[in-house]
């Protein structure tokens, strides 16, 4: 199972303890926020995103740092300000086919936490969709498609989709984003059916 497979700065995680540390909703949001910003962010900035106090957010940042999931970033000039960043570009979470029950349960908890976050985003969009401009309303897309593939074809499909997304990742974009650009959640999953 993956979050993203092709990235030269990919971090691979198979340790159940690390997976459990990552499975907290606030930590998922913190890592996502920091991963979208090349310069990183402060605990206060992260707190605004996750809806916690800066001190509670600092606790979560330290917990993530314990496992190397975040690290202190170079200062923006204010020595009193502590910046954090995600050291790798993407994360591969994979207990492995032969994983024991503890690793399998930790992987499942982490994937389910991400699935809950994805569903929350979808519900949020549906609640406010009528207030969006026609431009954004008309370009939002929901699709659920069953396809017939070999394992090799599925691997090729996954790589092709990830390759299409790669240039749009905030940390990979060159220069300032175009006027009117917004963060868009692209929720892509491929799961072989029984």
Task: Give a label for each model feature.
Residues 2-29:
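Short alpha-helical segments that sit at the start of domains
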Residues 20-24, 42, 75-98:
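Short, cationic-aromatic polyanion-contact patches
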Residues 45-49:
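A short acidic, leucine-rich amphipathic alpha-helix
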Residues 131-194:
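Charged, low-complexity intrinsically disordered regulatory/assembly segments
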């Amino acid at each position: 199972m993956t979050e993203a497979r092709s990235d030269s700065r990919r971090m691979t995680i198979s340790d159940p303890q690390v997976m459990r540390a990552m499975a907290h909703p606030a930590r998922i949001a913190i890592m996502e926020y920091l991963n979208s910003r090349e310069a990183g962010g402060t605990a206060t900035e992260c707190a605004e995103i996750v809806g916690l106090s800066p001190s509670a957010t600092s606790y979560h940042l330290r917990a993530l740092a314990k496992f190397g999931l975040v690290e202190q970033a170079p200062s923006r000039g204010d020595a009193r300000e502590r910046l954090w960043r995600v050291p790798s570009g993407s994360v591969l979470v994979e207990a492995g086919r032969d994983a024991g029950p503890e690793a399998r349960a930790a992987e499942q908890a982490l994937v389910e936490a991400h699935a809950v976050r994805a569903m929350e985003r979808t519900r949020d969009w549906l609640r406010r969709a009528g207030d969006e401009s026609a431009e954004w309303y008309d370009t939002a897309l929901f699709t659920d498609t069953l396809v017939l593939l070999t394992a090799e074809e599925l691997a090729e499909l996954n790589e092709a989709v990830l390759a299409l997304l790669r240039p749009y990742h905030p940390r990979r974009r060159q220069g300032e984003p175009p006027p009117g650009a917004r963060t868009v959640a692209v929720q892509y999953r491929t799961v072989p059916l029984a």
